[in-house]
């Protein structure tokens, strides 16, 4: 079953997000099996929501790619907070929205 991952980034912003995302998703290409990546501002930071094949797969991605990307971007004050939940239903139109 797919899993949704909510990532809250206190003190995050669009510029910091773009720095990190350029490293982890070259050419805006999601890893195989990922269904959704959504990002935007929230009060006090930035929020990212992903729908991924499993929590374990995401945790491997976070350890191997995401954390090193934060370090490379020089963002030690941003500590991601992860929340996971199983996806019961996902409805998509198949079009990009922003």
Say what each PLM segment does.
Residues 1-49, 53-68, 75-98:
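Short S/T/G/P-rich N-terminal loop/turn motif that feeds into the first structured element of a domain
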């Amino acid at each position: 079953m797919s899993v949704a991952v909510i990532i809250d980034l206190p003190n995050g912003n669009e510029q910091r997000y773009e720095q990190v995302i350029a490293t982890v998703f070259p050419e805006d290409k999601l890893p195989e099996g990922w269904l959704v990546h959504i990002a935007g501002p929230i009060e006090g930071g930035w929020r990212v929501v992903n729908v991924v094949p499993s929590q374990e797969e995401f945790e491997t991605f976070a350890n191997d790619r995401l954390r090193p990307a934060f370090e490379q971007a020089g963002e030690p004050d941003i500590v991601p907070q992860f929340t996971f939940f199983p996806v019961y239903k996902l409805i998509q139109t198949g079009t990009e929205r922003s």
